[in-house]
Amino acid sequence: MKKILALTGAASLLTIGVASTASADRAYHTERVTLLPVDDAPLRSGSVVNIHANGPQVYALERYLLNGALPNHEYEIALTVHVFDPTCAGPALEFFRVPISTNRAGNGHAKAPTIPPEAVAGLEGAHGVNWIVYNDADIAVYETGCEDVVLD
């Protein structure tokens, strides 16, 4: 009897664990996307962390990291979306820009405003997404490639 109760308890915990992870985005998972320099802009490394939680309060989060960029510099990173065009062949819409300031070593980080579920209502499907970092003269200095992002 103790063995049956132990197995039942373990099965219940496993079910709870599976149910809680199933609420995360099944179509698009968290991804770290590399930022690459445009022309000769200095950059040791850079990335965008794109997180799709698909929660009732938070649909998505984004984090931005620069390492070895220009020191003590102001940048802005733009989220651009090619709506229903996962190849990024057509025109893009710029959804928002987020400021990033670097320290004396050229390192900086920032996060986008939380994206609520209602902001993506009606956009279910595949989209081409890329991120572009602009310097204070509004010139693109870093960018990602085209990422195929599926919203569900």
Region annotations inferred by a language model:
Residues 24-152:
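N-terminal leader/targeting pre-sequences
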Residues 1-4:
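Positively charged n-region of N-terminal signal peptides that target proteins for export
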